[in-house]
């Protein structure tokens, strides 16, 4: 996979997700939903948005005349949303908010042209009220899905319904878990004729 972005994207060696980057990219390229399981510290949270950028997702990769959309990346807690955004921006050597930013209650560090938006799952849930098809996004990463909060459970159900409909076949969904719940999450997203 060639890097379509103007960014220099590096993947720290030693992280399991970096080591399996090609496999993850192939899965993202071929499937609408992928489930990534890996323990804490495997690089899921920081490397998956960079992999999505490498696949041509996010506003900075929009072609002329194409609707520019973001990579949405949910975190269960506000502090995680802001610290993960800072970390990814640092790894991409870009100012916080320019390419990667965050939005949490009472705080928004996101430029109009940002490609990756870190947020709490509650923020994304609230956005379903004003943007029911989640048109602002070309990719949604639901991180730490094993935490099974009401917000996460509702979002997973909402996304499944959205993907079943005819209007968002372009949307990619990545669900991450620190536990081996892959089969349960895959069954949740499997359609009658299409396994997840």
Which residues does each PLM region occupy?
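Conserved P-loop NTPase motor core
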Residues: 1-196
């Amino acid at each position: 996979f060639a890097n379509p972005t103007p960014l220099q994207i590096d993947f720290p060696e030693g992280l399991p997700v970096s080591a399996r980057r090609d496999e993850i990219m192939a899965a993202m390229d071929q499937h609408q939903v992928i489930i990534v399981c890996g323990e804490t510290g495997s690089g899921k949270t920081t490397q998956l948005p960079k992999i999505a950028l490498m696949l041509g997702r996010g506003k900075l990769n929009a072609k002329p005349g194409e609707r520019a959309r973001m990579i949405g990346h949910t975190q269960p807690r506000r502090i995680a949303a802001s610290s993960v955004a800072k970390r990814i921006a640092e790894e991409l050597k870009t100012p916080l908010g320019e390419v990667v930013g965050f939005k949490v209650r009472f705080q928004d560090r996101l430029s109009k042209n940002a490609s990756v938006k870190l947020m709490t799952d509650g923020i994304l849930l609230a956005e379903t009220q004003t943007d029911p098809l989640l048109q602002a996004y070309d990719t949604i990463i639901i991180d730490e899905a094993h935490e099974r909060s009401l917000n996460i459970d509702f979002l997973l159900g909402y996304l499944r319904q959205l993907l079943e409909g005819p209007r968002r076949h372009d949307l990619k969904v990545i669900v991450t878990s620190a536990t081996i719940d892959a089969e349960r999450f895959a069954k949740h997203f499997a359609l009658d004729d299409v396994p997840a």
